[in-house]
Curated annotation (Swiss-Prot):
It comes from Bartonella quintana (strain Toulouse) (Rochalimaea quintana). Transiently phosphorylated on a His residue during the reaction cycle. Phosphorylation strongly increases the affinity for substrates and increases the rate of nicotinate D-ribonucleotide production. Dephosphorylation regenerates the low-affinity form of the enzyme, leading to product release. NCBIfam families: NAPRTase (TIGR01514), PRK05321.1 (NF003704). InterPro entries: N/Namide_PRibTrfase, NAPRTase_N, Nic_PRibTrfase, Nic_PRibTrfase-Fam, Nicotinate_pribotase-like_C. Pathway: Cofactor biosynthesis; NAD(+) biosynthesis; nicotinate D-ribonucleotide from nicotinate: step 1/1. SUPFAM superfamilies: Nicotinate/Quinolinate PRTase C-terminal domain-like, Nicotinate/Quinolinate PRTase N-terminal domain-like. This is Nicotinate phosphoribosyltransferase.
Length: 434
């Protein structure tokens, strides 16, 4: 395969606009899976997604030029799904299933376009909102994050000369390859790329994906990035995200409905998908409360993705719950995906090996680890915790608690109401870097 010289490309900016988002498929696969369900079941729900910089010490509006940001957002607005992309979505097999996307949904999707954005700045931060039907606004999450992340990378490299850029990418490649060699020592490990939203750049993500494909072979199970899956003949991977229970909970009218909201999401999901896509994301309002109130049928699902508890503690709690429900954990799947670095992956692998099926969704540490790679110290390569979350549904505030209080999102009064209702049992505060 012909690999572009990334350093040369970064250095030679002779074009008017170098698009960060090249396709509406440059997103996570679970956004399309969720979109089909949202379009089918919740066509009249309006939501707001909001960019949230959890690393307040990093002033994004000082690092990133507003004109460049608007140009990239405007370019994303201009994108439509191409005929080739629609044929691929219709004809490809995903998770062993053909026609996972129904013809009526694809007919609607071919004319899809992102809704307008609202951008202002305050105290060194960008205030970025996306309003509109849930079936449209949801698709801004990944492009918005990838645009901010790559613009930050470009700003960091703006004053590097050609030689310094060569050194930067040579060191980053060596750093990445040393991680690949570390993973090769773990028999039967399953690794996938979950690094789109906070990647250094699209070209760098592609290089990392191809490095994993070359380096660990069948242990590399695929990528969450739909465009890269299509381009590199990999599996497109992903299930569902916190936005589903966040929105459904925000729409409830009483405590009984609020209690049932996380499980209503699973029932909706099961109407659309099955088999290996039956993965539970338990931590939106706290894993402990979710497990305590879960109907027995939840234990029949394929697996869980513990997303905010420490991986070993979170995995052990779910294994214990499976055993309480009479299930053999060795037949179940745990997908670990929260702030993983290669050492955490290795430790978690050794801890659970032989006790449960495992897979690791490797994100920012895979696609944006440039710390120490530049010839001189560049602060803007330091880790940034940036998210784009649903904050309102039909005018009501949406909340995410999570097992880590540092990740709590929402209106303070609503957060307290949710804490009073769901509790905070077994919440563990951990620093968040990504």
């Amino acid at each position: 395969m012909n690999h572009p010289d990334i350093a040369q490309r970064v250095y030679n900016h002779t074009w008017k606009l170098d698009p960060i988002i090249r396709s509406l498929l440059d997103t996570d696969f679970y956004k399309l899976l969720m979109l089909q369900m949202i379009w089918g079941l919740y066509p009249n729900v309006n939501v707001t997604f909001t960019l949230i910089n959890r690393t307040k010490t990093i002033r994004l509006a000082d690092d990133i030029d507003e004109g460049e940001l608007r140009a990239q957002l405007d370019h994303a607005l201009s994108l439509r799904f191409t005929k080739k992309e629609m044929i691929w979505l219709a004809g490809n097999t995903f998770y062993g299933r053909k026609q996972i996307f129904k013809p009526d949904f694809l007919h609607w999707l071919k004319n899809f376009q992102l809704p307008e954005y609202e951008l202002t700045r305050k105290d060194g931060q960008y205030i970025l909102h996306f309003h509109g039907p849930w079936s449209h606004s949801s698709m801004w999450e990944i492009p918005a994050l990838a645009i901010i992340s790559e613009l930050r990378s470009r700003a960091a490299m703006k004053n590097l000369d050609r030689f310094a850029l060569d050194v930067l990418y040579a060191r980053a490649k060596a750093k990445m390859w040393s991680k690949v060699e570390q993973l090769k020592k773990l028999p039967d490990i399953k690794i996938s790329d979950f690094g789109t939203r906070r990647r250094h750049s699209f070209l760098w993500q592609r290089w990392c994906v191809e490095a994993l494909k070359e380096g660990i072979g069948d242990s590399f199970t695929g990528t969450s990035n739909v465009l890269l899956a299509m381009a590199t003949d990999l599996e497109a991977l992903g299930t569902n995200a916190h936005e589903l229970p966040m929105v459904i909970a925000a729409l409830t009218n009483n405590d009984n409905e609020l209690c049932k909201a996380p499980y209503q999401v699973l029932q909706d999901w099961n109407r659309y998908y099955g088999g290996n896509l039956l993965i539970v994301l338990p931590d939106t309002f706290g894993t402990e409360t979710f497990l305590r109130n879960a109907p027995d049928w939840v234990a029949d699902w394929t697996g869980f993705r513990p997303d905010s508890a420490p991986p070993i503690e979170g995995g052990e709690r779910i294994i214990q719950w499976w055993k309480e429900k009479g299930k053999d954990p060795r037949e179940k799947l745990l997908i670990f995906s929260d702030a993983l670095d290669v050492n955490t992956i290795e430790q978690t692998y050794h801890h659970f090996h032989g006790r449960v099926r495992m897979s690791f969704g490797w994100g920012t540490d895979l696609t944006n680890d440039f710390v120490g790679c530049a010839p001189q110290k560049i602060a803007t390569f330091d880790a940034l915790s940036l998210v784009c979350k649903v904050t309102h549904a039909n005018g009501r505030p949406a909340v995410k608690l999570s097992d880590n209080p540092e990740k709590t999102i929402g209106d303070p009064r609503e957060i307290q109401r949710y804490l009073n209702f769901f509790g905070n049992e077994n919440f563990i505060t951990r620093p968040i870097n990504t």
